[in-house]
């Protein structure tokens, strides 16, 4: 059985009580959820269910919305790709925020333009990660100071992204050139070797990174066998000779 969608091992008891009661719809809990988002950013924890509950409160109470909290939730959701969390959060935001300013038929409300730009830039990062365009992800992240501002509150953002990239890679390859993996992880030299050996537990041999065998990257043929009873087969043949009504 898989892990439930609403499960978060580090979730405090008072947050769990709110999420499982009617108070999750109480606007007075907004500050509590916002503080919890800040805690997640500081302690490298993550609680998608609680974050989505906060965005839902913002939908019903727009006057309580905090732009910084929204962007922090989106940035945190990037650190758990390839899960759909970023898209789930994105679809709880007002439609005008998701529309490119240049193509919007109406001017954004006061204060919306900066948030709209930030959300759209984060959406670009999500697209690059989802499409496994990791080298372009790192170059895009370094291309604009706004990205640095957006990820500043999320402790260990780059390390968390690298761990997710490495996890995804380990599911599909057994060996990869070091130079290519350096581009995918956005690091090189001693830092790269340390990450590969100490964090990933992989080895480097003759200019290539060796990924240990696991159930995902093991090439194994699959034989599927189905048993069809004679009565089922005869029923198919009989229907072929039946006259249409």
From Swiss-Prot:
One of its GO terms (cellular component) is eukaryotic 48S preinitiation complex. The keyword DNA-binding does not apply. One of its GO terms (biological process) is formation of cytoplasmic translation initiation complex. The keyword DNA-binding does not apply. Coiled coil: none annotated. Gene3D superfamilies: ARM repeat, domain 1 (1.25.40.250), Winged helix-like DNA-binding domain superfamily/Winged helix DNA-binding domain (1.10.10.10). This is Eukaryotic translation initiation factor 3 subunit K. One of its GO terms (molecular function) is RNA binding. Pfam families: CSN8_PSD8_EIF3K (PF10075). Component of the eukaryotic translation initiation factor 3 (eIF-3) complex, which is involved in protein synthesis of a specialized repertoire of mRNAs and, together with other initiation factors, stimulates binding of mRNA and methionyl-tRNAi to the 40S ribosome. The eIF-3 complex specifically targets and initiates translation of a subset of mRNAs involved in cell proliferation. InterPro entries: ARM-type_fold, CSN8_PSD8_EIF3K, eIF3k, PCI_dom, Transl_init_fac_sub12_N_euk, WH-like_DNA-bd_sf, WH_DNA-bd_sf. The lineage of its organism: Eukaryota, Fungi, Dikarya, Ascomycota, Pezizomycotina. It comes from the Eukaryota.
């Amino acid at each position: 059985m898989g892990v439930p969608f609403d499960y978060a091992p580090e979730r405090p008891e008072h947050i769990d009580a709110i999420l499982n009661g009617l108070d999750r719809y109480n606007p007075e809990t907004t500050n509590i959820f916002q503080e919890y988002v800040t805690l997640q950013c500081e302690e490298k924890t993550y609680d998608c269910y609680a974050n989505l509950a906060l965005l839902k409160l913002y939908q019903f109470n727009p006057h309580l919305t905090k732009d910084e909290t929204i962007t922090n939730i989106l940035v945190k959701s990037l650190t758990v790709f390839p899960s759909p969390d970023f898209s789930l959060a994105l679809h709880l935001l007002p439609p005008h925020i998701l529309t490119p300013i240049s193509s919007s038929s109406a001017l954004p409300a006061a204060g919306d333009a900066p948030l709209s730009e930030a959300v759209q830039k984060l959406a670009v990062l999500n697209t690059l990660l989802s499409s496994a365009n990791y080298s372009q992800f790192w170059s895009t992240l370094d291309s604009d100071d706004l990205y640095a501002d957006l990820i500043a509150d999320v402790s260990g953002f780059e390390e968390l992204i690298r761990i997710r990239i490495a996890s995804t890679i380990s599911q599909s390859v057994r060996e990869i050139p070091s130079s290519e993996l350096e581009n995918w992880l956005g690091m090189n030299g001693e830092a790269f070797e340390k990450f590969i050996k100490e964090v990933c537990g992989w080895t480097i041999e003759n200019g290539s990174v060796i990924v240990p065998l696991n159930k995902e990257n093991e090439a194994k043929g699959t034989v599927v066998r189905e048993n069809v009873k004679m009565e089922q087969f005869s029923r198919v043949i009989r229907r072929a000779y039946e006259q249409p009504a």
